Amino acid sequence: MSLIEQLNWRYATKRMNNAKVPVEKVDKIKEAIRLAPTSFGLQGFKVFEIEDAALRQRIYNEACQQPQILEGSNILVFAAYKKITAELVDEYMQNTAKTRNIPVESLDGFRAAFDGAVAGSEEQNFLWNAKQTYIALGTGLIAAAEEQVDATPIEGFNPAALDEILGLSPQNLGSVTILVLGYRDTVEDKYAAASKVRKSTEDLYVKL
């Protein structure tokens, strides 16, 4: 299928059939998320893979008991850094220098510009990083569609409770969104055969 056909195929699956997604497909989706663009390339977030059944149940209880949490194959929790610390920036600069085989000192000017761009309160840092997670989330949704894997993004959960469950606060992290991977239950999910509702091209785009 073409990209547009894949995007027409996908939808926010409400019920899944408990079938496991092959590891190679999950790995491709994860790699797409890793390669997603972010501002400065910082990737100011972590992605937690929930494999423990007890953790999954606790997340389900704090996520409005949405059935996909229990019925899906894979659960990914996106958590953004609350504060862009000097340590995070040091790691980023070292990784850049190593990857591009250049002296880290050659990045001093870039670092100064970077430090100025991300200067701000913890709230501002978290909101900025949270926005970046949505770019990665969207990339993951497209990659899942390409692999014919259903994917449901979830924001309906108690962030404070999820942070506590996963021990995020001591790691300078806060939960942002959840991505469930799996396969649609065409019997139980009434939306599986429903037509996709979107604005028309004319309504969405404004030419100036």
Name each model-derived stretch:
Residues 1-208:
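Acidic, surface-exposed loops and disordered segments
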